[in-house]
Every structure is written in structure tokens, then in C-alpha cells.
Amino acid sequence: ALVLPAKYIGGFMMVVRAFIGQLTLHLCEPRALPEVPEGLDFVSMTPAQFIALQEAGKPLKVKTLLLGGSALASRFDSASYQGVYLGYGMTETASHVALRPLGSPIYTAVGSTGFSVNTDECLCISAPHLGIAQLQTQDRVRLLDKKRFHYEGRLDHVINSGGIKLHPEKFESVCDAHSIQAVMSAKGHERYGQVPVMVLRTMDDV
């Protein structure tokens, strides 16, 4: 089922998967609390949508559920959710290149994907089936072997809020141009993974 906007990579990849696999794609209105038919084989959605369904008492009855785009709150990251996986990927990889089942901290490569790390212990991705060779990320990991890793966090200051990446430096520079001192950081959020928090101080007399 397609429950994400098709104009963004997460939703568009569902269209691609259905086309390549000659699968029947059920179209659902993309919203925070999606209406998903029962008995489907595969659904992809954001952690925020998954949490909204759980809190509304509407557990999904599908074979496989793929979550991606942002972090998942720890209280929902449980092995009790059978058939639910968190995907690891980015726009540059077009789709997920690794998966981990809920309740496990270990991501495992998809297909011919292989992993290594650079001198900053950041993940490097090689995926021949996607035409990717040594794509360097800003994600720090503990590499277990060429196919598995444990995600440990970002090297940079990017804030991932519900799948939207925010760069604090850009917001801070705009404020600086208006004589406002600003510092932006991230605060953990159960539904969106992170939310931005900004402290402002004017440099002019009030």
C-alpha cells in the first residue's frame, strides 16, 4: 500500500517497487493516521505514522512493514512487533540499503550492499546493484562485519525531524544577519525522532 506522498523518495520508491515487481499497489490518502487495508503483503510508512496507529489502537495487519525517514521512539522499538523493520538509506541510495527488525540494534545489508568505515568511523556504502561505490556518509557506526553495523549517531549537527533534515548553521546565519545571536540544537521527540530547539538573543538594545 502507498501511504506516503509519491512526490517524495519514500513514496516514489513504493511506486517503483510495484512497477518492477508487477505488484498491485493500493493507494491510500497520505496522512498522519493512515487507513490501511488488512491482509496486505508490504507497507512502507514513517515512524510517526506507525506510532499514530499504535496510539489510536489500530495495529496493522500486514505481512511486512517498513519504517524509515527518522528515528523510532524506544518504547515502540520492540521485538513484539513482528514483521516490522527499520530501513537505513538516503536520497543518494534511492532506497534502503540495510534493515533491522524492531528490538534489534543491528542493521543488515540488503542484496549485494557492503559496508566499511572511514577514519572518522563513519559508514561508507558500496552497492553494485545501485551503481554506488564507497559512498561516504556522516553517520557514525560500529561496524560488525562487511554486512552488519550498529548505528551510533551523526557526525555533523543535522537534525532529522520526522524525515526532514534541518541544518542548524543555516538558521543561525539567517538570525546573525538580523543582529540576533542564535543557537539551534535538537530535542528528542517520541513521534518525530527529533525536533529543533533554538535559543535567541538580540544584540541590539531593547
Question: Predicted regions span which residues?
Answer:
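AMP-binding/adenylate-forming core of the ANL superfamily
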Residues: 114-142, 148, 201
